[in-house]
C-alpha cells in the first residue's frame, strides 16, 4: 500500500487504520493479522522504510510512504483463502489511508499481476 503523489502516511492515522482492520502490533515490531483462535499470523505489515518495524513509542511522529503486506504459505487456510483475506484487508487499509494497492515493484496492482498471485496461491492447501 503506497501513498499517492509522493505523500506520506502519518503514524497516528496508520495505527488507527490497521487496528480497525484487525491487526495487532507484535513480534519484530510489525502488525499482524490473526484468524480467530490461531496463534500464527495469516499475514503481517511492515514499514517500507528500513528497518521495517513500527515503534509504538515513536508512532506519533512516524511518516512513511508505504506499507508492505506479506504472508507465508502454506497457512492455516488455503492459499486462495489467505490471499483473498490479505487482498480484502489491503484494499480496506489503502482506501482508509487514501493510498494505492501496489505490487512488489511499487507499481499499481494490475489484473495480470493479481491473476499471477492467485495462480501461485492455488498451489497451497491449508496446513
Which residues does each predicted region cover?
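Short, highly charged
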Residues: 1-59
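Active-site-adjacent structural patch at catalytic or cofactor/ligand-binding sites
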Residues: 43-50, 61-75, 88
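Well-ordered alpha/beta subsegment
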Residues: 68-127
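Short flexible coil/turn linkers enriched for glycine and charged/polar residues
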Residues: 37, 62-64, 93
Amino acid at each position: 500500500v503506497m501513498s499517492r503523489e509522493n505523500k506520506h502516511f502519518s503514524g497516528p492515522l496508520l495505527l488507527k487504520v490497521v487496528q480497525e482492520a484487525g491487526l495487532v502490533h507484535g513480534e519484530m515490531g510489525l502488525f499482524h493479522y490473526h484468524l480467530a483462535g490461531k496463534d500464527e499470523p495469516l499475514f503481517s505489515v511492515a514499514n517500507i522504510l528500513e528497518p521495517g518495524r513500527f515503534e509504538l513509542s515513536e508512532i506519533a511522529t512516524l511518516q512513511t510512504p508505504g506499507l508492505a503486506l506479506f504472508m507465508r504459505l502454506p497457512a492455516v487456510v488455503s492459499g486462495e483463502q489467505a490471499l483473498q483475506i490479505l487482498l480484502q484487508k489491503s484494499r480496506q487499509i489503502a482506501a482508509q489511508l487514501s493510498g494505492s494497492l501496489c505490487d512488489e515493484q511499487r507499481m499499481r496492482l494490475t489484473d495480470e499481476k493479481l491473476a499471477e498471485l492467485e495462480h501461485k496461491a492455488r498451489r497451497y492447501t491449508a496446513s
